[in-house]
């Protein structure tokens, strides 16, 4: 059974990293429901913070389905941007500007290049949709940053 099995997935893609549709395509054929997908420009938003509208969607879907049923997938091109997004959906908006300011959801959050995601989806589809980006992204730094945020703030240790 996959970590993603039966979960509601919120996808926050990055124009310069992994776009939302690529992650959504990878999730086809496994037992998940993509409830929201967006592709943003992380560099374009204030200090790389998560878009305020996306924060609102994350908050609303978490209220609707329960934090235990939500997984957030990010596709940020840089470890720092991925970490800010992960921190926002776990510990609250670090910029204190959006709907998640001071809201500690503790959600499960993964980057598309992490082994937890890669191992849960069809490898051929992953290679077709995301594999090329692994060559240009600093995968090790992204994984390290995401693990650190989850260790500090995620409420679910599965």
From Swiss-Prot:
This is Glycine/sarcosine/betaine reductase complex component A. The keyword Nucleotidyltransferase does not apply. The gene is grdA. The keyword Oxidoreductase applies. Keywords: Oxidoreductase, Selenocysteine. In the first step of glycine, betaine and sarcosine reductases, the substrate is bound to component PB via a Schiff base intermediate. Then the PB-activated substrate is nucleophilically attacked by the selenol anion of component PA to transform it to a carboxymethylated selenoether and the respective amine. By action of component PC, acetyl phosphate is formed, leaving component PA in its oxidized state. Finally component PA becomes reduced by the thioredoxin system to start a new catalytic cycle of reductive deamination. It holds the Pfam family GRDA. GO terms for molecular function: betaine reductase activity; glycine reductase activity; sarcosine reductase activity. GO terms for cellular component: glycine reductase complex. Its EC number is 1.21.4.2, 1.21.4.3, 1.21.4.4. Belongs to the GrdA family.
